[in-house]
């Protein structure tokens, strides 16, 4: 019997709206779910000991990753309320963008992010450049898709108007 976090990850995939499933089926090469952290999964051993882009830890401590059109989700504990939804958020951000731009690079999301920026609690989401915006996109998607909307309000320092605008964006675009 697989551990509960693996079962939850698979259940999350099954529960996604059809529009998201179609985008992922068209845009991704693979989704890997298994035991351990990222370096233990899908021939990702080369990431063992390598620092994360944030520089705060290494990939060994990480329960999920997205890159090269692959979602990888393991059983390691994670601060993310839902690792699978977070990685799906990154994947959608990538595959739903246009050309070399991710969806979070679009003018529409960029404007939404700028509106939310003064309310963001986490320095991780306020990082300059692409990283903060992409992580906010993935975390916001994860909070909404996993039915943990209060987590989105908390990310935005209790600003419900900004949280509602973010929820509306994801509802219109992805049906969540």
Region annotations inferred by a language model:
Residues 1-176:
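Active-site-flanking segments in enzyme catalytic domains
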